[in-house]
A protein has these predicted regions:
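Short N-terminal micro-motifs specific to bacterial/archaeal maturation
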Residues: 122-125, 192, 200, 234
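General structural signal for secondary-structure boundaries
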Residues: 21-24, 77, 205-206, 238-243
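An amphipathic, hydrophobic-aromatic interaction surface with interspersed Lys/Arg
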Residues: 1-62, 66, 70, 130-225
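Long amphipathic alpha-helical segments with strong coiled-coil/leucine-zipper propensity
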Residues: 80-166
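Extended, charge-biased low-complexity segments
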Residues: 57-86, 94
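Long, intrinsically disordered, low-complexity Ser/Thr/Pro-rich regulatory/activation regions
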Residues: 229-251
């Protein structure tokens, strides 16, 4: 499903806390630090369980705790995460690991504890999961379901091992196949004749790229089937599906 706001580059409201802006192609391709933030902002509880499955730890951190751990332990990570929030929110934040809270709208240098902590806009453990899903949405990814609470640790570890096996199989299949890299996708869009060129394609939202490719493929399949019918193909075997439909939708 294509989100029209993200397609046109408009932000999504995250409750009454902040707006989350869809990054552009330039944002993603020209900023290695943001790639790190993307992984950190989107990591799921299941992925953390998979990472810690063979480690003897008393408790596996939540995605929010994992973010704070990275910020607290590494100054470079702290700078990168602040940069990532600025790019997504278009406003500064202050991260306070000791209080387990992210204050929106003020940088560390600007924050006045006497004035800005009365009714602050914050991201914390209570709303971080929902914030992550908004981030996933502006990046063109699918939101995830909340993790199962109070699940038996043995069941969690068993599920983690199954996912590890599935990833290994997927990697083997990927090596045999020929995946299309992002550069090839944006080059293909520049050849569609819709006004996008290497000079301006960096201005569209990052999430648009697979959507434009998908719509183009649907249109191409429809055109091929129509031409085949005009050339005398068997109508029972060639049944054009109209291309203006939601991506992956069967009609």
């Amino acid at each position: 499903m294509i989100n029209e706001k993200i397609f046109l580059g408009f932000p999504l409201d995250f409750k009454d806390v902040c707006k989350v802006y869809p990054p552009t192609v330039n944002d993603m391709c020209g900023d290695e630090e943001f790639e790190y933030c993307q992984t950190l902002f989107m990591i799921t509880q299941e992925e953390l369980e998979d990472a810690y499955v063979n480690e003897n730890v008393p408790a596996i951190p939540t995605p929010f705790q994992y973010l704070l751990m990275n910020v607290h332990q590494d100054d470079v990570a702290r700078v990168n995460v602040l940069h990532g929030f600025q790019k997504l929110l278009h406003e500064p934040v202050t991260i306070v690991p000791e209080l387990e809270v992210i204050i929106i709208g003020k940088s560390e240098e600007e924050l006045d504890p006497d004035k800005d902590l009365e009714n602050p806009r914050v991201i914390d453990a209570n709303n971080y999961f929902d914030f992550q899903n908004v981030v996933r949405t502006v990046l063109g990814a699918q939101p995830v379901e909340p993790p199962v609470e109070d699940e038996d640790p043995r069941i969690r570890r068993y599920k983690a091992k199954i996912r590890a096996s599935e990833r290994m199989i997927a990697r083997k299949k990927q090596k045999k196949g020929s995946g299309t890299n992002f550069g090839t996708l944006i080059a293909a869009i520049c050849c569609m004749g819709i006004g996008l060129t290497p000079l301006n394609i960096g201005e569209i939202s990052y999430a648009c790229v697979p959507w434009l490719i998908g719509m183009s493929q649907q249109k191409e399949e429809y055109d091929i089937d129509i031409r085949a019918l005009l050339a005398g193909a068997d109508k029972k075997k060639v049944k054009p599906k109209y291309w203006i439909k939601d991506l992956n939708e069967e009609i």
